[in-house]
Amino acid sequence: MPLAVSFAAVPSLAQAQEGSAPAATSSKIMALPDLIDGKRIFTPAYFTADSPQNAADMVGRVPGFDIEDGDNVRGFGGAAGNVLIDGARPTSKSENLVSILSRIPANNVERIELLQGAAAGALAPGKTQVVNVVRKADAKSGGSWALQIDGVSSGFILPSLEASYTARLGRLNVTAGIETEYDDADNLVGFEGFQDPNGVFLERGPNDDRRRARYGKLTLGADGAFGAYKLSLNANWFRGAFRRNWVHVSTRTGATLPFRVDQGRETNDETNWEIGGDIERDIAGWTGKIALLAKSGDQANESLAGFNLIGAPKSFGRFLSSDMTIERVGRLTFKRKFGAHQVEVGGEYAFNSLDFVGVFAQGNGGVFIAQPGDISATQVQEARREAFVSDSWTISPTLTLEATLTGEWSTISQSGDAAKERSFFYPKPRLKAVWKPRDGWTYRGEIERDVGQLDFGAFADSASVGDGNQNSGNPELRPEQNLNYVLGVERRWGKRGVLNASVRYEQITDKLELVPTIGGGVALGNIPEATKWGYNLSLTLPLDNLLQGLEVEGSYRWRDSELNDPLTDSVRPFSGNNGNQFNANIRYDMPARKLRLGAWIWRGNHNRDYRPDQRFEWSTINNWGMFVETKAIQGLTIELGVENPDGNTFSRVRTDYRPDRRSGTISRIQYRERSTDGTWYLSVKGKF
């Protein structure tokens, strides 16, 4: 309800701010940034009060804009984010946009462009809103660094370091960076136990779950102009490790001594590398560009669990797996302006492969024996080709229309335990209209058909030994096809005021869900039809009329979905479909004192998952924190903050059915509750 009141109050607040600005603030500062050819230009002066260290700090302060990295998919087509650098999207797929922007010093940024309508479609087809970071032609050498120390109330300290340096070498701007972090030290403590169908505990006991993770990353990038050619290159190397050890001691209701000890561990070691680049030049009135990428990754995983009666011989189940992934991508595009039309044509070829070996074994914790049927080995390869043509048409100064037609051809082959080869073709049309009846108001409508990509891991067997569940591989999977409808409106006022609202509806064919197999197992399979719908609201509300420098931001996302359950044929939501998320933060800037105060809250992740004989439900999670930031020391940004200082508690309920969910007969309920430590952090950023 408070959120609804805030949104309802927007028009009157907007009118108050537009009608009477404080005497000390000029109308020019309170006005929207200049709108030129569909672009709102944010010069460095706009961000002066924020004293940004890098381009990421600047983009993060563009009102009404959130950085989106794009989808984690194979190839370039669906992986594009909503940030461009000098009019081009970064070639790297392994790095997120914030990391890339953090390596661009703020004093090397000429301007930030917020593109909408035809301007966005011309540079990034399919995107509703795009930010373009334009660097200075005479960019200077310089570097930046960030050191952060995170602490938990139990006493564990987590350090992280990022540093990058940009230098001019001949015609190239060269940037090198390093990141290293001990980024996870969760000590989850709590209890769990089994209940009868009436919710009465039959057994329960304490649980201790400790997790540790660390990673290191090296990056190198170069770009420059050589006559008519523009060149960009990038490379990165990543290595990470994860460790988890857990133990649970269970005591029957009414007893004084435990009767069973459950324990297990999980490990993951990962190494990835990526090399990519693009070259661009004008050819006969067209701007041609070719982008190339090569990446590879290796993972080794172990999952072990045992549920052992005290005094009895120990028995454990263990699942070992290793995999190697390869991706090679080439994309060629040509674009040209024909009067009111911006036309782009192109094609893409992507090759991806997965080599996977998994072994399930049982033993006493020291010696494990695998049965022949418990060994899974497979190789999956996909060759995907895509051709497209798009037209961004400026019908009038207030109306633009973007139309795209894409054809996708793919062949997926699988060798090993279940050899198979299949080919697919999918047309993917998209139509988007943007109407701006007057400055500050934008309406948009979109219709798009997109096609998901299959997770190669679903072709191979897998296991969650901690829950005692195994999934079979399915070589017959088909990708999901979505028909999406979106309507949205945006209202801007003053220097930073923004209100965004949108509704969406999705018709899904071949929805992926866990289904029972003929042999009595469980595998990922396709549901013929499903639907999903919801709305998004977001608000940036300056409150300078109440207190100079005060600002509130908030967002709310609501989703619902339905499909016919493949087992019961009843209607239910998707697995993993959380209904809503709420996020809000408030900040108070005091530029004269070079001080900023803030607080935030996040609520969401009420998920459900379904298996043929089980249902899982997770509680809603509430996170909150606050911070103080100072730039009183020349060249440094220092921030001290806390997150969930009193800790956090969440739960999971697993309901087991006999023989499966069709019967409605509950055999037992597992209740699991975990608590985390409160955390604090100290961050120091600087330049050199």
Q: What are the residue ranges of the model-derived segments?
A:
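A beta-strand signature from Gram-negative outer-membrane beta-barrel systems
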Residues: A106-G142, K687
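Outer-membrane beta-barrel signature, preferentially recognizing the C-terminal barrel domain
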Residues: G264-N272, D323, S376-E382, E446-N500, ...
